Amino acid sequence: MVSKILFGKKISWLLTIFVLWVIVFVLQKPFFLLFTGEGLSSLYAVLWHGLPLDLSLAGYMTAVPGLLLLLGSLPFHCVHTPFVKRVVSSSYQCWMVLAAVLVSLSFVANIALYPYWQFPLDATPLFYIASSPKDAIASVSYWQLLLGLVAVIGISFLIYSLFKTIGRRFSTTLCQPVSTLPWLFLLVFVAALFLPIRGGWSTSTMNTGKAYFSNHQRLNHAAVNPLFSFMESVTHQEDFSSMYRLMDEQQAHRLVSTMLSSKSEADSTVSSSFLTVQRPDIYLIVLESFSDTLMSVANVTPGLNHLKKEGVYFSNFYANSFRTDRGLLSILYGYPAPATVSLMKYPKKTAALTSMPQLLKQAGWDLQYYYGGDADFTNMRSFLINQGFLQIVEDVDFPVSQRISKWGVPDHLLFQRVKKDLRQTKTSTPILRVIQTSSSHEPFDVPFYRLNDKVLNAFAYTDSCVTDFLKCLRSSPQWNRSLVILLPDHLGAWPLDIDNFSFARYHIPMIWTGGAVRQPQKVDTFASQQDLAATLLGSLGIAHVALPFSKDMFNPAAPHFAFFMMNDGFGLMDAHHGVTYDFKRQQIVHAFGDKQQQYVQAGKAYTQTIFNDIATR
């Protein structure tokens, strides 16, 4: 009986610590809203959407006391000496002091710096302090420093006092042994902190993008836990300005100047003759892992093969990289996604970039995003909201019974939801609907059987889903004003065992179809995913000067080439010349044409320019 009471007290002590940390983090948010002049009208939404990050950080903060509790509860009386008890007790006190200071410092710094930087606390202050402490505080007055110091000390004292009071209530609990079975239960309980820390069992781990919910950035930033944001930034910190220093900046600028669209080209609003409607409804279907080679395999993509003949087929189109997060960046932002880093994980940087959906929204298009998986995977939510996608349909918007694949909802159910929403849409406003498929991805488990090969069968399934969706759209009143754009996020799974440095590794199809397309056409211009944005905007008569890396494939005055990056390498090609280059080996891997060294230098300059641009964001 005594053992059960003791076990209950230990569990209560740990739960109390966890709950108190959550309360501390929740209380930060109204203060942030008030200090930034936002008011409290959206407080409930801020608290609710910020709660997952608060729970995660509370899990981190409770993990150390949890480990100390396990040590102090070991079912071996020989280790429970006065010395061990003092060490455990002192360690707990030291941790609480440190935790209180860290939390208060992040809270005060976030409020103090936000009016100047307009983004949640991250590792940027560390960079400035490390590079020049004097310059870092040069613009701060003495009274501001003093006030900040007083605030940090005061808040630290309040937090520490709160936990010290709780510790006093359970002072005899921490260092008392329990029998083996209760200790094992304690171990399971402490290990369960992994769930709030990680954010559950889903494929995505906890990230700041989880808190994003509003088109008003300040509310998103209010929901973000500042210490969590700082920790995430520190662990993902990259010094982009020092990456890929391959040549003198003047030389790089000279080489790249001919590879970027000029301002006059980007300002061009001459509509393409490919479209019959100036402001069409746009359906952008992002096909998971499809390749151009796949379309030549018998009976796999009969739907796409038919669309290829009746629409506009881009025969020399290439993926910018090899992962979904990179592909989405290139497709939506018109940006050459670097292979060695995922910009989607840096909300501050993607918020500083202009995207094609943003420009469409400014021009009057209504935006909505459909994805059958977890929209918090790799910070996707903040990535989308930063572009203006406030309506995001994801796995949690479907019944649990329909989330039957590893990646969430199968493609046919995703398209059914799109069709349902379209039937209910009554608006004269042009729409942009981005539909991201996921079923043609490992483990390739799909509710469909036509081919013996599991991988090819999954591609055939997605092809059938697209075909059914377009059949439905074709019979609807929306068809005549519809522009449907199909392209993959990257090539994956087929062909098997393809060389990462081969040109074919990045060759993907792009097809434009729909009632708004004037006539079938084959476009042989060499281009990459990054060029879709400028091409689409130019076809709609919308300037794209804010997308300097994107090139209009229909504009004969624009430069035309395909660029892509693999891990620590790049590919650059056009109709006459091409190279893939390995930075690690510092050598050409594949090439054709007689200007190989010129293309290597151009590719190096382009890579250096990309990372220069990232560093400034």
Can you describe what each PLM-predicted range is?
Residues 24, 130-133, 224-227, 240, ...:
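Alpha-helix initiation and N-capping motif
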Residues 2-240:
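Transmembrane and membrane-interface helices of multi-pass
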Residues 145-154, 250-255, 384:
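Long, well-ordered, tryptophan-enriched scaffold segments
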Residues 257-617:
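Solvent-exposed soluble domains appended to multi-pass membrane proteins
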Residues 33, 90, 162-169, 216-219, ...:
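Charged, low-complexity, helix-prone segments enriched in Lys/Glu/Asp/Gln
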Residues 83-87, 242-251, 344-348, 549-551:
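Short alpha-helical "patches" and their helix-cap loops
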Residues 216, 223-228, 232-270, 278, ...:
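The feature marks either
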